[in-house]
Amino acid sequence: MYDFSGLKALFLNGTLKKSPEVSNTEGLIEASRKIMEKHGVKTKVIRAIDHHIAPGVYPDMTEHGWNIDEWPAIQKEVMEADILVIAGPIWLGDNSSETKKIIERLYANSGELNKAGQYAYYGRVGGCLITGNEDGVKHCAMDILYSLQHPGYVIPPQADAG
């Protein structure tokens, strides 16, 4: 059995359902989370809709007219994770608005550099989980995985599930 102790994975849930409402996306996250934890990975789940995340493409939208923006605290969690999984439902054949907002906000920090002068997301692993009863899982996964690799995440083969 593989041991990945020391690695941290963060699941960002783009469901449109506020806690404690049951989310099918949360159910799929839990299945993936159990597999990771079985192999020693520490995991955390953040349900985006439960937070006041301002839309936009700047690291802190309170500097651009918004009264509240909880993204900077979430971004700190993103940077502490070795693995980032963006999860969300399909609505009308596309990713949910919350999932798209997560991607926008990740991109807002894409210009930051690490200590080696590389993009801050460089060398981290990305993946996605998609739920829904509509066609379009591969399309939604394609959008998310491209959005992760563009700023530096490594996307391994078959890094999506739906």
Task: Pin down the residues of each PLM region.
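N-terminal beta1-alpha1-beta2 submodule of the flavodoxin-like/Rossmannoid cofactor-binding fold
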Residues: 1-116
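Short, glycine-/small-residue-rich phosphate/pyrophosphate-handling segment
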Residues: 23, 115-161
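Ligand-binding pocket scaffold of soluble enzyme catalytic domains
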Residues: 2-5, 9-13, 127-129, 157, ...
